[in-house]
Curated annotation (Swiss-Prot):
A cellular component term, taken from the record's GO annotations: extracellular region
Disulfide bond residue pairs: none
Protein name (Swiss-Prot/TrEMBL): Probable outer membrane protein pmp16
Subcellular location: Secreted, Cell wall; Cell outer membrane
Length: 952
């Protein structure tokens, strides 16, 4: 149980401190589940606003102004454009506008900086006051409004607005490339940093913007306006440590729109305080407005650690829409009603996770002596709709309250596109907590599930007056509960209460891991003993029963079901003697009706019924009829999901093989040019290798694209005995056909080549020894569930080739050479584990072996016209004498399911061809171009080499 001490006096005592720009400590319950995200935001804050800690010294301690002449004339416009820098520091004015007062104000195209710091107005606008509009745009240097202040004028009376800037027209901050600072500004009444009676627009800025530690005791700790739009900004915007009455950061009388921002928008540690909790003030810890929309933001929106003395720890509003945005998080916020959100009377709230997740965690209300977790509080006639697109979640780790009367049903996933998850979970509430309101959400009105999944997990529960499942899936997990309750208009009776469930799923992994089945409960109405059965409500459970995991997928690939399981408790029913839970059309035997991948087997469900007498001392024992659904599991094998099969894991061996084979074949230049035979030559070669492997039943094909270079140093004796040392390096990408799976590789090959002529060059033999090392990065995509995983392995390849050719001269310019060559290659790769979604482990069980015997004829034609040139044509038949395909064992780590994959069944006969051109540009320099390829019914290869030879 959360034991938060009474806070009213504590925060009332801090109200005075807030007025002077100090921020009260905000109580935090437990470690934020979004800890990593919070750390990233801390780093983002530090890097985005590097000048924050040095603003006081940076702006100086002596009065400075860039301008001479009349700076205070409410009928004239002031335009400050194309200045290198602007300074207005420590200026005092006895009425509006400590530094400047005018009709319309424009600040644009400042190159270096603009400082408005430590200015004081005895009236509105501590730094700038405008009768008309104020625009700050297209500035390249930092813009700093620091420690400006607007004080009430005792002689004229009236309220003051805008600690830094106040205007009666519209206020615009747009297209700035310099970081914007509103820091430590304060005012006696409205808008701690800025206030406008018109529309405030913060739009299209390309630099961060900060509202920090601004205060306004009457409202709008950072800004106050009629309407505010924050849109199209690409860098972070922070509202941090601001303090006001209504709206710790922002207060508007009509709307706030946050839209199309690719940079994050953060509301952190803002506070709404009031001198009295009963005054109706002190609401909206971050935002207080009539209409708030958060739409189409790719960037993250965060409300964290905001506090109010009354309504809505983060937001107090009548109309709220969140849709088509990236992640939106509400964490660690606190209020008296509505830990995160307060929905005022006749409200409409649409929370749709359509391009990112929406999450509520660790939000709290402290209405009673002991604080409790709460996300949303709905007042009378609220219209609340919660939705999520497929692949996204609207998650509540804190309960919601939907208890005041309304004619609008609470709707889960209202639209056809809402096929995602609405999650209620108490996973982050301490195990020791036993305060029911920390776990249970309540609707004393009508509720409907229309699409997608409503998931209740980890001790969370719902109390419904009326719940109807019109579509979608209701999923229950560990210790979850659904109970009946009274009507909001007649809280003393539950007449008419009914829960209708027609498509129930159980989160099997959570049941097996934590051991407590979910419950459907006809709940007694009494709040204290003695408790009695409630004979008014009914629960109707019908349709199939399915098993799912946390991702709303079947669980057979996410847990180990390789062994038999007995007496798995799937569901509990707590009923009354009159049997008001109807299961006549409920079919748990449907567990065996669906086909699936993963572990195969048979479920044997059965009911156990227990009848007792009422024990009225406890609400859990008041009912008399208990039924429990159990099931036994008999495993029958394992069926691999094709998306997890992992054929991609064999491609590093094939890629290593094709690289090595092509290099060994390129050495087959027996009887090279008679143009010149140097003692020493060095070759530099650019390589391109392309391979297409056709798909076969059960295994997809692949394409290899490889580029690299090779270096060779050769020495030849007068007897034409030749030895070469070679080094090659390749950068390769292999893509699986029919998917986005791919392998990126870096291969190196070292080789030794020896060529020996025999019997006065009647024939010649050649030998090649080579070793290759490969570094392979595998990237797998599983499109059905938008998953991806990656891993790295290493390959070792050994190769040897022996060749023999029989050169003979047909004519003086034409040479023909029949040849035969034996190429043996062995390749092996290391074991590895993936990281990412549903990772797998791969273990090499059999290496790759290949023995190929190319044989054919090579013809050379030489010409010395203009420059010595040689053409070589070659045709060969390439039978595979022996091959052992690689075999790799695969284990899906989540379930322990395992299987083997084999490499492609390479066709054993191929036709090879080669074209080679060599031109002697100079006595010591040759250029050559070499193309060789092969084709078979399964595979085609293309190897292109271009290089030069230096002769010594």
């Amino acid at each position: 149980m959360s034991k938060t001490p009474p806070k009213f006096l504590f925060y009332l005592g801090n109200f005075t401190a807030c007025m002077f720009g100090m921020t009260p400590a905000v109580y935090s319950l437990q470690t934020d589940s979004l800890e990593k995200f919070a750390l990233e935001r801390d780093e983002e804050f530090r890097t985005s606003f590097p000048l924050l800690d040095s603003l006081s010294t940076l702006t100086g301690f002596s009065p400075i102004t860039t301008f001479v002449g009349n700076r205070h004339n409410s009928s004239q416009d002031i335009v400050l454009s194309n200045y290198k820098s602007i300074d207005n520091i420590l200026l005092l004015w006895t009425s509006a506008g400590g530094a400047v007062s005018c009709n319309n104000f424009l600040l644009s195209n400042v190159e270096d900086h603009a400082f408005f710091s430590k200015n004081l107005a005895i009236g509105t606008g501590g730094a700038i006051a405008c009768q008309g509009a104020c625009t700050i745009t297209k500035n390249r240097g930092p813009l700093i409004f620091f420690s400006n202040r607007g004080l009430n004028n005792a002689s004229t009376g009236g309220e003051t607005r805008g600690g830094a800037i106040a205007c009666n027209g519209d206020f615009t901050i747009s297209q700035n490339q310099g970081t914007f600072y509103f820091v430590n500004n304060s005012v006696n009444n409205w808008g701690g940093a800025l206030s406008t009676n018109g529309h405030c627009r913060i739009q299209s800025n390309r630099a961060p913007l900060l509202f920090f530690n601004n205060t306004a005791p009457s409202g709008g700790g950072a800004l106050r306006s009629e309407n505010t739009t924050i849109s199209d900004n690409t860098r972070p915007i922070y509202f941090k440590n601001n303090c006001g009455n209504n709206g710790g950061a922002i207060q508007t009388s009509v709307t706030v729109a946050i839209k199309n921002n690719s940079g994050s928008v953060i509301f952190n540690n803002n506070t709404a305080l009031s001198g009295s909790i009963n005054s109706g003030n002190g609401s909206g810890g971050a935002i207080y407005t009539t209409n708030l929309s958060i739409d189409d933001n790719p960037g993250t929106i965060l409300f964290n650690n905001n506090y109010c003395i009354r309504d809505g720890g983060a937001i107090c509003t009548q109309f709220l829409t969140i849709k088509n945005s990236g992640h939106v998080y509400f964490t660690n916020n606190q209020g008296n009603w509505g830990g995160a959100l307060m929905l005022l009377q006749d409200s409409t709230c649409l929370l749709f996770a359509e391009q990112g997740n929406i999450a509520f965690q660790n939000n709290e209300v402290f209405l009673t002596t002991f604080g409790r977790y709460n996300a949303i509080h709905c007042t009378p006639n609220s219209n609340l709709q919660l939705g999520a697109n497929k692949g996204y979640t609207t998650a509540f780790f804190d309960p919601i309250e939907h208890q005041h009367p309304t004619t609008n049903p609470l709707i889960f996933n209202p639209n056809a596109n809402h096929q995602g998850t609405i999650l209620f979970s108490s996973a982050y509430i301490p195990e020791a907590s036993d305060y029911e309101n920390n776990f249970i959400s309540s609707s004393k009105n009508t509720s409907e599930l229309r699409n997608g999944v409503l998931s209740i997990e980890d001790r969370a529960g719902w109390q419904f007056y009326k719940f109807t499942q019109k579509g979608g899936i209701l999923k229950l997990g560990h210790a979850a509960s659904i109970a009946t309750t009274a009507n909001s208009e007649t809280p003393s009776t539950s007449v008419g209460s009914q829960v209708i469930i027609n498509n129930l799923a159980i989160n099997l992994p959570s049941i097996l891991a934590k051991g407590k089945a979910p419950t459907l409960w006809i709940r007694p109405l009494q709040s204290s003993a003695p408790f009695t059965e409630d004979n008014n409500p009914t629960i109707t459970l019908s349709g199939p029963l399915t098993l799912l995991n946390e991702e709303n997928r079947d669980p057979y690939d996410s847990i180990d079901l390789s062994e038999p399981l007995q007496n798995i408790h799937l569901l509990s029913l707590s009923d009354v003697t009159a049997r008001h839970i109807n299961t006549d059309n409920f079919h748990p035997e449907s567990l065996n009706a669906t086909e699936h991948y993963g572990y195969q087997g048979i479920w044997s469900p059965y009911w156990v019924e227990t009848i007792t007498t009422t024990n009225n001392a406890s609400i859990e024992t008041a009912n008399t009829l208990y039924r429990a659904l159990y099931a036994n599991w008999t495993p029958l094998g394992y069926k691999v999901n094709p998306e997890y099969q992992g054929d991609l894991a064999t491609t590093p061996l094939w890629q290593s093989f094709h690289t090595m084979f092509s290099l060994l074949r390129s050495y087959n230049r027996t009887g090279d040019s008679d143009i010149e035979r140097p003692f020493l030559e060095i070759q530099g070669i650019a390589d391109g290798l392309f391979v297409h492997q056709n798909s076969i039943p059960g295994a997809p094909g692949f394409r290899i694209q490889s580029t690299g270079y090779s270096l060779q140093a050769s020495s030849e004796t007068s007897l034409h005995q030749k030895i070469s040392l070679g080094f090659a390096q390749f950068f390769t990408r292999t893509k699986e056909i029919g998917s986005s799976n791919n392998v990126s590789a870096h291969n190196t090959v070292s080789s030794l080549y020896v060529e020996l002529p025999w019997f006065q060059e009647a024939f010649a033999t050649s030998t090649v020894l080579a070793y290759g090392y490969g570094d392979h990065h595998l990237h797998s995509l599983h499109p059905s569930h938008q998953e991806q995983a990656e891993g790295t392995c290493y390959s070792h390849t050994l190769a040897a080739a022996i060749g023999c050719s029989f050169p003979w001269q047909q004519k003086s310019y034409l040479h023909l050479s029949p040849f035969v060559q034996a190429i043996a290659i062995r390749s092996h790769q290391t074991a590895f584990e993936e990281i990412g979604d549903n990772p797998r482990k791969f273990v090499s069980q059999k290496p790759f072996y290949n023995l190929t015997l190319p044989l054919g004829i090579q013809g050379k034609w030489q010409s010395k016209f203009h420059v010595p040139t040689e053409w070589t044509l070659e045709l060969s038949y390439q039978p595979v004498l022996y091959q052992q395909n690689p075999q790799i064992g695969v284990t899906l780590l989540a379930s322990g399911g395992s299987w083997d994959i084999l490499g492609h069944n390479y066709v054993r006969n191929a036709l090879g061809y080669k074209v080679h051109n060599q031109t002697a540009l100079f006595r010591s320099l040759d250029l050559f171009l070499d193309y060789q390829g092969s084709v078979s019914s399964s595979t085609s290869t293309h190897h292109l080499q271009a290089g030069s030879t230096l002769k010594f």
